[in-house]
Amino acid sequence: MRILFLTDNFPPEVNAPASRTFEHCREWVKAGHQVTVITGAPNFPTGKVFPGYRNRLWQRETLDGIQVVRVWTYITANTEVAKRTLDFLSFMVFGFLAGLVQRRPDVIIGTSPQFFTNCAAWMLSVFRWRPFIFELRDLWPESIKTVGAMRDSVALRLMERLERFLYRRSAAVVAVTESFRRNLIARGINGDQIVVITNGVDLSRFQPMPRDPELAEQLRLTGKFVAGYIGTH
């Protein structure tokens, strides 16, 4: 199968979308699929392009068998909403154009946030006559409103309408939590269209370690049951 994946972030960037996308694509390559990722020059979160890269109109490289196409975007730090929106829109445009000249895929995947990436993926699915899958890692723009980055406005309501449009136009929505699935169903999205695939872990890299008595003593945890949680969901 030929898979075309659009993502705003990809290694060497280190964040949730970059890691999740890379690990999934790497496993698909191991399974014998041909994977092409369209992304931008690595710059997150500072807005400065990583050493060894340039913000060019077109760059190609191969990472662990994944064909990576990097396109020009309006680069800015992860701070001002207006500038970040320009960044998102520029990737939507140039990511779409890059997708038009790739070998025709069997499936097109866009990951969100931000969902302008999925706008490009949906448009490509229309022009290339291929199914579009919406990967939902966070509820956007709801999360923007929740953290106070945007107030309720005409612009926000238009974004919410676009969000629902993309859900309905996708062949499937892949959500990372059951709560996201319930949220979409409550908003009128067909539950049969939604698949939950939670974030996983590479057990070849992460294994339980034997208890460290000296560390437990230092932290005054000797004889106590200790549980830790790392994550946002």
What are these regions (language model features)?
Residues 8, 73-83, 126-161, 204:
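Acceptor-binding helix/loop patch of EC 2.4 sugar-transfer enzymes
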Residues 220-233:
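Conserved donor-binding/catalytic core segment of Leloir-type glycosyltransferases
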Residues 31, 96-100, 116-119, 123-127, ...:
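Membrane-proximal helix-turn-helix segments that form the acceptor-binding/catalytic region
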Residues 14, 84-100, 105-137, 141-142:
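An aromatic- and histidine-rich active-site surface loop
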Residues 179, 200:
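Carbohydrate-associated surface elements
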Residues 1-64:
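N-terminal subdomain of nucleotide-sugar transferases
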Residues 37-102:
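A conserved catalytic-core segment of Leloir-type glycosyltransferases
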Residues 185, 191-192, 201-217:
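Acidic anion/phosphate-binding donor-loop and adjacent secondary structure
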